[in-house]
Amino acid sequence: FLSLIPHAINAISAIANHF
């Protein structure tokens, strides 16, 4: 589960970077 957190943060960061 802990290995999934950085992936979620990376996805949110990518979405935030898109906007």
Swiss-Prot record:
One of its GO terms (cellular component) is extracellular region. It is found in: Secreted. Expressed by the skin glands. GO terms for biological process: defense response. The keyword Secreted applies. The modification Phenylalanine amide is found at F19. Keywords: Amidation, Amphibian defense peptide, Antimicrobial, Secreted. Transmembrane segments: none annotated. The keyword Nucleotide-binding does not apply. Its main location: secreted. Belongs to the frog skin active peptide (FSAP) family. Phylloseptin subfamily. Has antimicrobial activity. This is Phylloseptin-J1.
